[in-house]
Amino acid sequence: SGFENLVALFGYSLQVYADFSGYTDMAIGVAMLMGFYLPKNFNSPYKAPNPGNFWKRWHISLSKWLQDYLYIPMGGNRGATFGTYCCIVTITAIGVILSGSLWIAAVVSVIALIITFVIWLKPEKRLKIHTNINSMNTMLLGGIWHGASWNFMIWGGLNGIGMVVFKFWKNRNVYLRTGILLLLLIAFLALAIFYPAPAFNIGVVWIGVIFI
C-alpha cells in the first residue's frame, strides 16, 4: 500500500544515514590506529532544526568543501559575483545537455528576468536575493557532484529550495510556518525518492506508488 511504501521511504533515509555514518566512523577508527586523526563527518543530522543546519551536520567534509570553494567564492551572503553567473550558465548548460532541449534555458531565462524585475522594483532585496541564488547554485552543483543526472539535479535543487524557504519561514506567523513545514516534509520525501532511483522516470513512478 501507499502507507507501507511511505514508511519504507522513511526507513530508507535511516538506512542511508546508518550506512554512510558507519562507514566513515570505521575509516576514522582505522586512521586513528595508524596515528591519523580525521574530523567527524556526521553530527546527528536528523536532529537538525532547519535545512541549513542539517547540512552543517551531514557529510560535514563535503559541506565544508562546498562552502569554502563554491558558496564563499561566489559571494556567499555578501552578494553576487562573476562566479555566481558562471555557475548559473554552467548549470543551465548541463540541464540542456541532459534534456536534449533548450526549454531549460528558456525557463532559466524567464526566472532571471523575473528576478531582475523584482530587484529593480525593490533594490533593498538585492542582497537577500543574491544570497539565495548563491545557496541554490551551491546545492545544485553539490547535486551534480554526486552524478550528472536529473535525479541528482532535482535532489540538489530541492535541498536548495528547502534552505531558501526556511529563511522565509522562520520570520512568519505560526499558521504560515506550519504550511511551509508540510511543504518541506514533502520535499524531504522527494529527496529520499530521487537519490536512490536509477533514473528520473523511475523516481516519478515511485512517487506515484506512494501518493496515488
Residue ranges of each PLM-predicted region?
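Membrane-embedded transmembrane alpha-helical bundles that form the catalytic cores
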Residues: 1-212
